Amino acid sequence: MKVRMYNVGFGDCFCLRDRKKSLLVDFGTNNSRIEGRPRREIFDVIISDLSTINRKNLLLTHFHMDHLSGLLYMMKNRDSSLDFGKIYLPDVFSKEEMSRTLVLLLLADLLKESGLPSRQVSLFALVDALLENRQNLELLSRGKIFEDKYQALWPDTDVIQRETDEVYNEICKNENLAAVMEELLNFAEKLRRIIWSMTEEGKAQTEKEQEKISLAYVYDREFRRIKAIPEFKELLSFLNTNKVNLRQFKHKISIVFQNARDGELNLLFTGDVQPGHLKMIAENYDGKLPLYEHYWCIKVPHHGTQEHYFDFSQYEPENMMISNGIHFANSKKESKELRTSPLYGGLFYIPDTHMYCSNCDCCDCYENGCSCKEADVISPAYYKDI
């Protein structure tokens, strides 16, 4: 068993490789260039590497472009040798009421602080790509065992639904926005049904239900129609003015998983999980899935940024991975917020832990050299095996 950590700058891409089957965890970046190389060159190197693996599945922790842009690139330049047996997604698709969450995810990419071009909506881009290249999908939520050896610790569908309803109902209190929110809800339900139709449970739908799914261009046209509604601009203005932080909803649904059985090579992958949710997981809030006492490898949440900092010292990790990189944000304040937290190194370094980082230029622990006693920086290489 080994973990291959790819250098994708401010993004995530890991491959859990063993002799029987491999699992790619996320595949994307926010950077247009990495180590001076165009990101498509990095993607091509990773794709070439993956093509040597016969049996492989993919897990997308959530729907930010820094986690899925490589997958979209791969699907656009389709090659049968790159097929995944299965793609795992967070479960925000199995029930009709989850369409409310999808509405918030769609809106998140259209707000000013989204960091994405207005035409690029990551959830819609993923559904669009899946319509063109249908895949076998499986939805993960707390307690679900997958690959016969891993178990999802998050998302908890009940918690997500509760947090969704709080925000969604608050928006709908504005009577001027009720009609456009209903339009978005109907559209989101169509997207939900598309994803659901690619799961084992969804494939059992009646032929009549399957026939309702249209070609990709039909949904693109409908989404453009909704965005052209005058009330839609009013909705975005309302969300921006009232600083409704929908971007965090993509973090709220992020998959967190560990080994299904306690052993010597315990893994903990945290995606971009929200700090409050990670605290709940660590405290075993429902008494069902405790974290283990010791981990061989922990993937630090959200590129090691200060806002998502978590103290893993009690778990005595042998290895910790921080997929960091320079993030060229719209402001100096935002760029600083996306640097690697100093609490992962220096005086706060966890003894006997080996740190693996993509890049040291964005780390607040790095001045005249790395402050971690045991560390490997992947840059300028393409990947590092752990």
Regions found by a protein language model. Name each.
Residues 1, 9-10, 262-263, 273-292, ...:
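C-terminal regulatory/interaction regions
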Residues 1-53, 249-279:
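Conserved beta-strand hairpin/beta-sheet module of binuclear metal-dependent hydrolase folds
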Residues 4-6, 23, 59, 88, ...:
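Hydrophobic/aromatic beta-strand patches that form the interior of the parallel beta-sheet core
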Residues 10-12, 31-33, 63-69, 94-97, ...:
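Active-site environment of divalent metal-dependent phosphoester hydrolases
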Residues 34, 243-244, 257-300, 306-311:
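Long, well-ordered mid-to-C-terminal structural blocks that present hydrophobic/aromatic surfaces
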Residues 42-43, 100-110, 123-130, 283-285, ...:
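Short, aromatic/basic amphipathic alpha-helical patches
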Residues 77-266, 353-386:
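Flexible, acidic/histidine-containing loops and adjacent segments that form or flank the divalent-metal
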